[in-house]
């Protein structure tokens, strides 16, 4: 009986129909772990087959996963891709953008059971198994706080299944140097080979040149983040230059693409457009 109850707990997933936004999407409540549940908002393509890809869309501090998902619908409607937008609720996952590994003030969270460094791997396994998908890789996008999540997942995710990623306008970063985590990797070292792997990935790194407000309401102003620059644009420039230096140090060319959007500030919709083109490329149905 106890074994049955354990299995019931593992596979307890709730399907919901949601029409509260301006489009229809489905929701699966992922509860197959000991962490707090996460609602996965998703939209299926016209036809799902073994070649269908999965693209994860990670929200920012606003946590409005439905709005983030809506920005991809028109461009993806004829593509062979499942769009998935996890909703990390604030009460359940207050520090989602650090993968739950540290607070935004820099305090390490020692309870690894709440860490989100296995989250995308588990979410992908669900969709892969449910729809019999052949690909072992997925695509992922994050803007602002979502960009923080994605670049740290590239560093600390339990899987290495990211095929392509696009990240835009993070408020601050984890540098590959000896500063205390989450500003650096002190006390949170990367596994062997991880630097070379993340350097080799196809990543679009986006910044808006007008995202330079040092007094933006959601900008992290802790000492560690201020050492990275006074605003998002400067911090992004410094982080990308840092990656180039790390690549030279490890004799590993940085494959990431760098793109500055002229005249754009911290605008989710406008910054998402180049990511859409980048990640949806080559996802047409095959004859």
Regions found by a protein language model. Give the residues of each.
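Short glycine-enriched nucleophile-adjacent loop
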Residues: 147-158
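C-terminal catalytic histidine-bearing segment of alpha/beta-hydrolase fold enzymes
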Residues: 234-287
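Serine-hydrolase catalytic machinery in alpha/beta-hydrolase-like enzymes
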Residues: 28-44, 51-137
């Amino acid at each position: 009986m106890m074994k049955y109850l354990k299995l019931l707990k593992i596979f307890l997933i709730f399907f919901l129909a949601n029409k509260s936004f301006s489009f229809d999407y489905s929701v699966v409540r992922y509860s197959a772990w000991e962490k707090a549940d996460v609602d996965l908002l998703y939209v299926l393509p016209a036809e799902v087959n073994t070649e269908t890809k999965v693209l994860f869309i990670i929200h920012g501090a606003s946590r409005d996963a439905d709005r983030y998902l809506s920005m991809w619908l028109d461009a993806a409607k004829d593509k062979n891709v499942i769009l998935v937008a996890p909703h990390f609720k604030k009460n359940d996952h207050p520090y989602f953008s650090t993968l739950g590994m540290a607070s935004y003030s820099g305090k390490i969270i020692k309870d690894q059971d709440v860490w989100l460094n296995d989250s995308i791997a588990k979410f992908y396994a669900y969709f892969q198994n449910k729809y019999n998908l052949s690909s072992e890789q997925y695509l992922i996008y994050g803007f602002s706080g979502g960009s923080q999540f994605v670049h740290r997942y590239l560093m600390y995710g339990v899987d290495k299944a990211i095929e392509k990623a696009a990240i835009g306008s993070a408020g601050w970063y984890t540098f590959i140097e000896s500063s205390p985590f989450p500003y650096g990797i002190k006390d949170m070292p990367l596994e062997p080979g991880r630097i070379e792997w993340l350097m080799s990935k196809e990543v679009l790194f986006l910044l808006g040149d007008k995202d330079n407000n040092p007094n933006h309401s959601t900008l992290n102003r802790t000492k560690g983040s201020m050492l990275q620059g006074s605003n998002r644009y400067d911090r992004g420039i410094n982080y990308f230059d840092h990656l180039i230096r790390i690549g030279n140090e490890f004799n590993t060319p940085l494959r990431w693409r760098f793109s500055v959007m002229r005249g754009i500030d911290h605008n989710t919709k406008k910054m998402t457009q180049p990511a859409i083109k980048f990640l949806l490329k080559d996802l047409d149905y095959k004859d």
